């Protein structure tokens, strides 16, 4: 079979001084960082949708890319050709994982019967590709937002028949993920929200969404799927407001429906931007809430109000993200999936490699900076000193519920408390982080 990327054998590590733009400068899969191989820390994945499904179209222009599998022809044959190219790409890029939506890998067809038949055939193709290449599935998911039937949502749709169709897609995609050895299953509610409150029953839709998630959890346990269920927060787009706005919002939703022990979060950098948060904030929040699962590594443009899905290129931003992840013990079933796409003007097929190589080097360098910060512990020491009072007798009595509000007021009066503000040393801490970032 002829290869698509015929000018490249494989992307390899050549070190910081290489001038080869199709080589890694910082990502060395076998390099030990904090006692673990870099590949095992980062758990990179390439996504099917942006890389092989997007044709370069946007709101103002038609497709700009010439991809052989996007031409007219038999849909199933073209899907198999796309799989050939995808796994050639995964292998040559040297990523251990990939991710997909159901209709990324398989044509939806004109009926539910066609959808099920096509997807079943393509799961067999993917299983064979995985066996041949050694590339594994980080997570699968179902696209319940693109088809016109989902104009008013899937789980939150006012029509229970649409809800049922979505359930069919999700159960089928979950089963496929299980069959393919996927380590997680992602739920992203692209249209689980509203565009106007004039035709929306918020309580009804929230109850529907909660029941849908409960059924997903029930199915997971019934089938014996041992992977992690993940919700991916996003505040808006394509709807005006989504119910999974950010990490904190999802936590409240999960608590309401008794799911906080069953579902974790897949945090995307660009979605944090849209929610008015930093990527660092959303990662730290997910960890603090006990919900951290996986990451969609990309970046947004703070000057634009939509999901640009650019490749991550800031070590300054991602070093702090990796610091939080390492401090929390690192990934378990999750990883760093590049939910990112080349720009519409990047029409050379090798631009797909340039985008991913730069992103992988960025995250590798971020990992090394984070590991050094964690090893030396200077940031942790300063934070610990700031909260040291809570380890004392008074702090512990408060936290353990041994004092009431009135007793605290009495304590303050009896001891004539006159606490003085202590500096937060923000500038010092920012300088400290820069020391690790730019230490040569």
UniProtKB/Swiss-Prot annotation:
Co-factor(s): Mg(2+)
Molecular function, one GO term: magnesium ion binding
Keyword Cytoplasm: yes
Annotated residues for binding of Mg(2+) 1: 232, 268, 296, 339
InterPro entries attached to this UniProt entry: Xyl_isomerase-like_sf (IPR036237), Xylose_isom_bac (IPR013452), Xylose_isomerase (IPR001998)
Alphabetical keyword list: Carbohydrate metabolism, Cytoplasm, Isomerase, Magnesium, Metal-binding, Xylose metabolism
Main enzyme class: isomerase
GO biological process, one term: D-xylose metabolic process
Source superkingdom: Bacteria
Protein's cellular compartments: Cytoplasm
Coarse class of the protein's main subcellular location: cytoplasm
Cofactor note: Binds 2 magnesium ions per subunit.
Gene3D superfamilies: Divalent-metal-dependent TIM barrel enzymes (3.20.20.150)
Positions of the catalytic residues: 101, 104
Reactions catalysed: alpha-D-xylose = alpha-D-xylulofuranose
One GO CC annotation: cytoplasm
Binding-site residues, Mg(2+) 2: 268, 271, 307, 309
EC number(s) stated in the UniProt entry for this protein: 5.3.1.5
Family affiliation: Belongs to the xylose isomerase family.
Subunit structure, interactors included: Homotetramer.
Name the record gives this protein: Xylose isomerase
Organism: Cronobacter sakazakii (strain ATCC BAA-894) (Enterobacter sakazakii)
Gene: xylA
């Amino acid at each position: 079979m002829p290869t698509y990327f015929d000018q490249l054998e494989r992307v390899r590590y050549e070190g910081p001084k290489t001038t080869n733009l199709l080589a890694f400068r910082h990502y060395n899969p076998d390099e030990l960082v904090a006692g673990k191989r870099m590949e095992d820390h980062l758990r990179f994945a390439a996504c099917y949708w942006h890389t092989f499904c997007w044709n370069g179209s946007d709101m103002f222009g038609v497709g700009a890319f010439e991809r052989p599998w996007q031409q007219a022809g038999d849909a199933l044959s073209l899907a198999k050709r796309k799989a050939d190219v995808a796994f050639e790409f995964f292998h040559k890029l040297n990523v251990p994982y990939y991710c997909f939506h159901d209709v990324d890998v398989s044509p939806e067809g004109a009926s539910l019967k066609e959808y099920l038949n096509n997807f079943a055939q393509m799961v067999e193709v993917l299983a064979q590709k995985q066996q041949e290449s050694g590339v594994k599935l980080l997570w699968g998911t179902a696209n319940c937002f693109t088809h016109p039937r989902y104009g008013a949502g899937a789980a939150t749709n006012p029509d229970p028949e649409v809800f049922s169709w979505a359930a069919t897609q999700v159960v089928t995609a979950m089963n496929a993920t299980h069959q393919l050895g996927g380590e997680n299953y992602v739920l992203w509610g692209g249209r689980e929200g509203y565009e106007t409150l004039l035709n929306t029953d918020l309580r009804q839709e929230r109850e529907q969404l909660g029941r849908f998630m409960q059924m997903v959890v029930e199915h997971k346990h019934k089938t014996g799927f041992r992977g992690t269920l993940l919700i991916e927060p996003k505040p808006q787009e394509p709807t005006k407001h989504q119910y999974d706005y950010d990490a904190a919002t999802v936590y409240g939703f999960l608590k309401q429906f008794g799911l906080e022990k069953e579902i974790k979060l897949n945090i995307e950098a660009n979605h944090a931007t849209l929610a008015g948060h930093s990527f660092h904030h959303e990662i730290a929040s997910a960890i603090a809430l006990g919900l951290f699962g996986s990451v969609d590594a990309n970046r947004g443009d703070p000057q634009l109000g939509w999901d640009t899905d650019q490749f991550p290129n800031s070590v300054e931003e991602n070093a702090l993200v990796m610091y939080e992840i390492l401090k929390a013990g690192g990934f378990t079933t999750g990883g760093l999936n590049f939910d990112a796409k080349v720009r519409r003007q990047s029409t050379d097929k090798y631009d797909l490699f340039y985008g991913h190589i730069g992103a992988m080097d960025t995250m590798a360098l971020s990992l090394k900076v984070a590991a050094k910060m964690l090893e030396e512990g200077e940031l942790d020491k300063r934070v610990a000193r700031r909260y040291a009072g809570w380890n004392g007798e008074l702090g512990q009595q408060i936290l353990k519920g041994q004092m009431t509000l009135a007793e605290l007021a009495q304590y303050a009066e009896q001891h004539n408390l006159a606490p003085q503000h202590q500096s937060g040393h923000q500038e010092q801490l920012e300088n400290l982080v820069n020391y690790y970032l730019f230490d040569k």
